[in-house]
Amino acid sequence: MSNKKADSKPQARYPVNLLDTPFPMRGDLPRREPQWVKDWQERKIYEKIRAASKGRKKFILHDGPPYANGDIHLGHAVNKILKDMIVKARNLAGFDAVYVPGWDCHGMPIEIQIEKQFGKSLPAAEVMQKARAYATEQIEKQKAGFRRLGVLGDWDNPYKTMNFANEAGEIRALAKIMEKGYVFRGLKPVNWCFDCGSALAEAEVEYKDKTDPTIDVMFTFADPEKTAHAFGLAALPRNEGGIVIWTTTPWTIPANQALNLHPEIVYALVDTPRGLLILAEERVEACLKSYGIAGTVIATAPGAKLANLRFNHPLASAHPSYKRTSPVYLGDYVTTETGTGIVHSSPAYGVEDFISCKTHGMADSDILSPVMGDGRYIESLALFGGLSIWDANPKIVEALDEAGTLLRTEKYLHSYMHCWRHKTPIIYRATSQWFAGMDIKPNDSDKTLRETALEGIEATAFYPSWGKQRLFAMIANRPDWTLSRQRQWGVPMAFFVHKETGELHPRTLELLEEVAKRVEVSGIEAWQTLDPRELIGDDANMYEKNRDTLDVWFDSGTTHWHVLRGSHKDELQFPADLYLEGSDQHRGWFHSSLLTASMLDGRPPYNALLTHGFTVDGEGRKMSKSLGNGIDPHEVSNRLGAEIIRLWIASTDYSGELAISEEILKRVTESYRRIRNTLRFLLANLSDFDIGKHARPVGEWLEIDRYAVALTANLQADILSHYDRYEFHPVVAKLQTFCSEDLGGFYLDVLKDRLYTTAADSKARRSAQTALYHIAHGLLRLMAPFLSFTAEEAWKVFQPQSETIYTETYHAYPDVPEASTLLDKWTLLRAVRSDVTKALEEARVANQIGSSLQAEVEIRAAGARHDALASLGADLKFVLITSGATVVKVDSVDEEGVDVITSKYLKCERCWHYRKDVGESAEHPTLCGRCISNLFGNGETRSAA
């Protein structure tokens, strides 16, 4: 480093070694950071990191792809910066840590954008063309945003799920799981969005409050005699009445086909003014009170006794088409927490309902499904045909009332399923879909998909650890995976289906490979334009192309297949070392990736999962437009610098919510300023130091320098253990403490006298600089993962011949002899120094002294304290920053103490110490003897400090 003395200032009569540095005090981050981003791109720094890391053990953090739609938000910034910190830390630790960013490109959000811009009547080929163009534009915008945050990666070669190779890879993954026997077609209730016109994945469902009408409805007796016998009666006292259900979905009543009771719950036959009512015994009092009637229990029976009884549909008297009966089935899922203890069953619109009816022998063809994909009833449905189910709710309530079967209705606020895109209510709807069976045993294993996935979870490391139980519970309880979607912009389930039987073509696996080859060349458009005769010849008369597309969670969930081992197999590898996403991805990408890898490989695609929380404001509230509490990372970068966002993320415990506000950013900015000032001090005092010319061997270092380097080496070992566990907030906290207390509050404070006043090339000063050189090397590398711009800026000043700090590895410190003993000794000395500092402050408050250099101290110490202090000799005063220090040995701790004496000597003009020899030199009457020696003689000698 070159000597940068402040030439603009007039030359002092007795100069000190006060050096300058081109590393400025002010970061000016909003202006400088974009210059570094441009510089990294132009100099191809990521490629140079790869070249420097070639041949090392790989570390693969596989990027969970953000959706290619819209500007990046603060959640994106948290996610990408956490990934960037880990990748940089792993590279510095000596790994070949590759980072290939990716994007999720297919699916509803982009299709909606195309519909908004161009309408809904575009042909499929044009939808795909415009969707590709839109996704490409969004990717470029997001890419620029991520680069601006200081994230280094293979931005020129990212993976995109819409790349032809990746689309083809998905089709091949589908073929593989079909070959193993996981895929089947069936009628099942699935999450259905009317606005999407498609099934939804579990991860695409969110819950919001919704107000619905609840109804208590009576299904009248169809066979009074059997009902009487079930309750142990010879006959019913009268035949009026029935069994009562409670539901929050009146729109499902037209499709009712059964009633469900718990086999062990006791049910009561109650005589009331509305007839004989069957209710769960423990719900009788609450129900009758809500109906405003009195009643008497005349018989009871467990649910098991009532199995297979039949009751009339509650609209039977309203229209002939409802003149049917509903049987009683038993189900363990029925409870008495709310309602009547009886559940009405519409198998097309409820998972338990469907399972119960199928278990009792109901055929798919017998299941009533009057609700169409757009949320309207089929025109042929009596009384309500053509109505939206939500509009039909009040009309159904009215019809039940007129039929005499409505006992009660009220408005009910409850948490209800909504589409995450449209924010509109969704339903369960039985449709014919393609599924991956959770409880299917493939033809190459004796374990079901669920069992394989759960075993995989046990073998995975989780950060934080609670993520394991969360994912385990989700997999343990989830239904079969609905793979199919009814959309255009997605990877096709490229099957040929028999027009009459619905069976797949016998050559399906072979045909999927043929389609994949075409998609690899021309994209998924190749399936749209494919003439079936090209592949199946005359069979095209009997088969039609399946129009379903794959769930977009299959797109991203198979990136371990078509990216790690496909489009980017040369850069990446399977399994990945780490997947890192927000906590919502336990039911999203973590989840779908686990299932696909369990099917394809019998193991998870990752060795570890890291979960981070969501951003909230300073009061812990979720960020939203309505609250106006959102924080835009682009705005913060332009106002304060991306480095402040990075430092905020690194200093926050990401395992919980990440709170941010202007006040928090202000505190982070102040923390950054203190770190920057520490770096500036180090760089300034190393600006005339050349390691090749000026370095001193460890054996010649002053004792405090050996201590400081040993302390920094210990800090590095501690911090690297945190980096290994992906813990960043302890790293920041310990570095901040080190900079402010160990360096600023102690070592650098003590060092200033030696750096500034001893001869420029003296052993004492070069010893200090050699220590500072190692400390600077260590600190810059330790900070580089999170303070990326600042570390690089400081590095280019510190090591201008080096291309970038990111091709380095963590600093190798020289071995300090007897480091442990040294650390213990100086821990004790610093404790004494704290006592002295307190005594000096008391003297200052009492106006006994001004600065600490105006004081001399006498320390009474016993045992090890005395020995440690005495070992420093004349250098003790430099450690205490006083003009004199003496140590008096005492016998016990009780006698220990500090006396502060105001110095009676004159102050040296140059070093500001009060010394007896100031004025003894006629030639330099304002200087002390050591300054005269340091300036004009052989220089002072120091051994400890």
From Swiss-Prot:
It holds the Pfam family Anticodon_1. SUPFAM superfamilies: Anticodon-binding domain of a subclass of class I aminoacyl-tRNA synthetases, Nucleotidylyl transferase, ValRS/IleRS/LeuRS editing domain. The keyword Transmembrane does not apply. Its cofactor is Zn(2+). It is an enzyme of class 6 (ligase). The keyword Metal-binding applies. IleRS has two distinct active sites: one for aminoacylation and one for editing. The misactivated valine is translocated from the active site to the editing site, which sterically excludes the correctly activated isoleucine. The single editing site contains two valyl binding pockets, one specific for each substrate (Val-AMP or Val-tRNA(Ile)). This is Isoleucine--tRNA ligase. It comes from Paraburkholderia phymatum (strain DSM 17167 / CIP 108236 / LMG 21445 / STM815) (Burkholderia phymatum).
